[in-house]
Swiss-Prot record:
Name by which UniProt lists this protein: Ribonuclease P protein component
Gene name per UniProt: rnpA
Keyword annotations from UniProtKB, A to Z: Endonuclease, Hydrolase, Nuclease, RNA-binding, tRNA processing
SUPFAM superfamilies listed in its UniProt record: Ribosomal protein S5 domain 2-like
NCBIfam families reported in the protein's UniProt record: rnpA (TIGR00188)
EC number: 3.1.26.5
GO molecular function: 3'-tRNA processing endoribonuclease activity; ribonuclease P activity; tRNA binding
The reaction(s) this protein catalyses: Endonucleolytic cleavage of RNA, removing 5'-extranucleotides from tRNA precursor
Length: 119
């Protein structure tokens, strides 16, 4: 049975980890969300979230977006390539309902899988 946990090892925790991804990322974007990815040597994917107050004003909206992004990553972690991912959002993401946000994230995860296979 596949474990769908979200332990500490699956998170980007330090600024150094985020900087590594920002240096030479592969991008997958929608109008509201961008997911940056860069291969790692760990054998499993990791995720970091940057939800700026500038783009999403209300804390409960930022928390909802982070919660949905983590859940989407958790459910797709076994299909994802061993990469470090950073999720960035733009203005307008707060207007998306949960279903639309989940579908957009799923589409971007699939795009990263295709990009990883192509390279």
């Amino acid at each position: 049975m596949v474990k769908l946990a979200f332990p500490r090892e699956l998170r980007l925790l330090t600024p150094k980890h985020f900087t590594y991804v920002f240096q030479q990322p592969q991008r997958a974007s929608s109008p509201e969300i961008t997911i940056l990815g860069r291969p790692n040597e760990l054998g499993h994917p990791r995720i970091g979230l940057t939800i700026a107050k500038k783009n999403v004003k209300r804390a409960h909206e930022r928390n909802r977006i982070k919660r949905l992004a983590r859940e989407s990553f958790r459910l797709n972690q076994h299909e994802l390539p061993p990469m470090d991912f950073v999720v960035l959002v733009r203005k307008g993401v707060a207007e998306l309902d949960n279903r639309a946000l989940t579908e957009a994230l799923g589409k971007l995860w699939r795009r990263h899988c295709r990009l990883a296979r192509a390279s």
